[in-house]
Amino acid sequence: MQLTNFTDFGLRALIYLGSLPEGELTSITVVTETFDVSRNHMVKIINKLGQEGYVKTIRGKNGGICLGKPADQIIIGDVIRAIEPLQVVNCAPEFCHITPACRLKGALAKAKQAFLDELDKHTIQDMLTDNSELLILLKRI
């Protein structure tokens, strides 16, 4: 299953925010530059993650962004469910005339569930714990 760029960069942003010392704020600009993505795209991603409670945004002169909850409470499968469309194929009868007899939809649904079940075992903290190489890369970029 391939994730959209929106979800890919959303997960990267959460990992980056999780790598910061607790309570430290950063800016969308810093996250944008870290991952070489357009600012407009990252603003949309951060807004969605904020709506879902994964990112806290603080406005004003001393404002910025940080994780909205502890990294060990942000389950990757939940993040994907919240921001990814997750429609593997379009099985509406008006788009596919074999839908009434097709078994592919069921197989794909099981595969999608297995994908999410695996990601439900991992948190943002899991991506950071004992991963000094990642932390070095995030600081160096």
UniProtKB/Swiss-Prot annotation:
Residues in HTH rrf2-type domain copies: 2-129
InterPro entries: TR_Rrf2-type_CS, Tscrpt_reg_Rrf2, Tscrpt_rep_HTH_NsrR, WH-like_DNA-bd_sf, WH_DNA-bd_sf
Gene3D superfamilies from the UniProt entry: Winged helix-like DNA-binding domain superfamily/Winged helix DNA-binding domain
DNA-binding span(s): 28-51
GO cellular component, as recorded: cytosol; protein-DNA complex
The keyword Ion transport is annotated on this UniProt entry: no
GO molecular function: 2 iron, 2 sulfur cluster binding; DNA-binding transcription repressor activity; iron ion binding; transcription cis-regulatory region binding
Entry keyword annotation includes GTP-binding: no
Residues the entry annotates as binding [2Fe-2S] cluster: 91, 96, 102
Cofactor annotation remark: Binds 1 [2Fe-2S] cluster per subunit.
Domain of life where this protein originates: Bacteria
SUPFAM superfamilies linked to this entry: Winged helix' DNA-binding domain
Pfam families according to UniProt: Rrf2
Keywords, comma-separated and alphabetical: 2Fe-2S, DNA-binding, Iron, Iron-sulfur, Metal-binding, Repressor, Transcription, Transcription regulation
Cofactor(s) the record lists: [2Fe-2S] cluster
UniProt xrefs under PANTHER family: HTH-TYPE TRANSCRIPTIONAL REPRESSOR NSRR, WINGED HELIX-TURN-HELIX TRANSCRIPTIONAL REGULATOR, RRF2 FAMILY
Function: Nitric oxide-sensitive repressor of genes involved in protecting the cell against nitrosative stress. May require iron for activity.
Name under which the protein is recorded: HTH-type transcriptional repressor NsrR
Organism: Aliivibrio fischeri (strain ATCC 700601 / ES114) (Vibrio fischeri)
